[in-house]
């Protein structure tokens, strides 16, 4: 079975900007039903749009890009994965940002590959598969 992917906010922001080519080329090769959006990522993106001086344009661009993508709600299985991951990271003294931790937990719980340009933080999470489509890694 082919991998399914969870797109991080930095990946979607780059796609909204129309760059880099490596990311855009990869996105068009993946079937839409294999691309997932976390409700947490959508909240981050909506916040960015609302803080923009050009809110209307940012809202429209975000809606167009995410049209057809059903945001994954944060469910009980995600919460349990979050608890395991956070406890493990705290034991190592290697905690990551709170929203990144929630997003990583969703990816782990649902066996999704997280697509992000922030691999340095995400690679601290045991069991998280992640890729960087912006740099071809």
Predicted regions and their residues:
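Short, well-structured N-terminal submotif of metal-dependent ribonuclease cores
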Residues: 1-37, 49-64, 136-137
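Acidic, PIN/NYN-like endoribonuclease modules and their adjacent C-terminal/linker elements
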Residues: 2, 104, 108-137
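Active-site neighborhoods of divalent-metal-dependent phosphate/nucleic-acid chemistry enzymes
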Residues: 3, 69-115
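Generic structural signal for small/hydrophobic residues in well-ordered secondary structure
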Residues: 8-9, 45, 82, 107, ...
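Alpha-helix capping/helix-boundary segments
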Residues: 11-12, 41, 78, 103, ...
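Nucleotide phosphate-binding site architecture
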Residues: 12-13, 43-46, 72, 123, ...
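Residue-level recognition of specific faces of alpha-helices
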Residues: 26, 39, 61, 68, ...
